[in-house]
Amino acid sequence: MFVDQVKIYVKAGNGGDGMVAFRREKFVPNGGPAGGDGGKGADVVFVVDEGLRTLVDFRFKRIFKAEHGEHGMSKSMHGRGAEDLVVKVPQGTIVKDIDTGEIIADLVAHGQRAVIAKAGRGGRGNKRFATPANPAPELSENGEPGQERNVQLELKVLADVGLVGFPSVGKSTLLSVVSAARPKIAAYHFTTIVPNLGMVDAGDGRSFVMADLPGLIEGASQGVGLGHQFLRHIERTRVIVHVIDMSGSEGRVPYEDYMAINNELEQYNLRLMERPQIIVANKMDMPDAEENLNEFKTKIAEDIPVFPISAVTKTGLRELLLAIADKLETTPEFPLNEILEQEDEDTVLYKYVAEEPDFEISREPDGTFVLSGAKIERLFTMTNFERDASISRFARQLRAMGVDEALRKRGAKDGDIVRLLDYEFEFMD
């Protein structure tokens, strides 16, 4: 089964909690704090495996949760960090964040790795909080929660050349005679419903990968039929080979077919029309094909190459394959996302991340004040509320961030309810 798009949930491991402990040893009356730090949680890491061909494994397992770090221990022993959760994906997999639409990773090379969900760091033990003013602190941190994401995996086949055209124009037949691929061939539309790849030998020592893509119909760019699924696989190709039935045996006009497919490519966007095209006039062994070809050439631009062939009789194939190989040598790869494009492997790409406020305050209809924000929520989840010293530290952190003053400006008074995540507190002025 060929599966090229799935949605999954990933959750990185939480950091281990820090420990509150003291050194208790004979003849050491003032041993001091000895609570260890928690261990780092496990990242969720995707790794490319060239042996995989589809995303079918993700149909049966859609939830991936990494292990948590161990908690800190007494005698200043730190918790062990968890081993990363490694998930294997096929070449050509794009990982997108469903909530933001951001492309997290574009995985194309065997062994390439990408951290999809980052683990939380371990909480600090009380030994970390010792100061001259407080040499024996009774506070520690909880581990930081690991990142969780709903992501979409899209598989876009890796091919140098993509065959496009209406159904039953001979794309599968062409691939079968120029490579060892054996796609399904039959005398009905949409015989090909999944991409087929074949390694093509041009005959002069050069070779390339050709993809036979399922037939397109008008409206494919808007998702008519299986348009989006089919067009997705064209994005990685460097050269588009447009196969046209020049015999008109299906009752269609070759030039209208050519314009209709190009319109779908343009509507789908992603710079597809910037890719060089080679037109293949197929079924030249059929009646009326020569006349239709002459008429077709009068309507298109002179600089667009047209190669008359017959995939059945194998005529004209050598000239076509050499022309494709020549075009590939002068055509660079097209990045799926310009932001991800790099000039070379040594280029360091920095991503700008807008600075978020430490916290935000909103108010619900019942008068409850709601605190939100990544920083304040992280401080809250890492606070050990079983320790009075930790609670006092959290209150000082809120005051230093300006939360108390901001609540007063919003009209908060003694006894008002303040909510943070799923917890509620009373405001005390």
Curated annotation (Swiss-Prot):
The keyword Hydrolase applies. Its main location: cytoplasm. GO terms for biological process: ribosome biogenesis. Keywords: Cytoplasm, GTP-binding, Hydrolase, Magnesium, Metal-binding, Nucleotide-binding. GO terms for cellular component: cytoplasm. It is found in: Cytoplasm. Coiled coil: none annotated. Pfam families: DUF1967 (PF09269), GTP1_OBG (PF01018), MMR_HSR1 (PF01926). Mg(2+) binds at S172, T192. Its EC number is 3.6.5.-. Residues 124-145 are annotated as: Disordered. PROSITE patterns: G_OBG, GTP1_OBG, OBG, OCT. GTP binds at residues 165-172, 190-194, 212-215, 282-285, 310-312. Its cofactor is Mg(2+). Belongs to the TRAFAC class OBG-HflX-like GTPase superfamily. OBG GTPase family. An essential GTPase which binds GTP, GDP and possibly (p)ppGpp with moderate affinity, with high nucleotide exchange rates and a fairly low GTP hydrolysis rate. Plays a role in control of the cell cycle, stress response, ribosome biogenesis and in those bacteria that undergo differentiation, in morphogenesis control. This is GTPase Obg. The gene is obg.
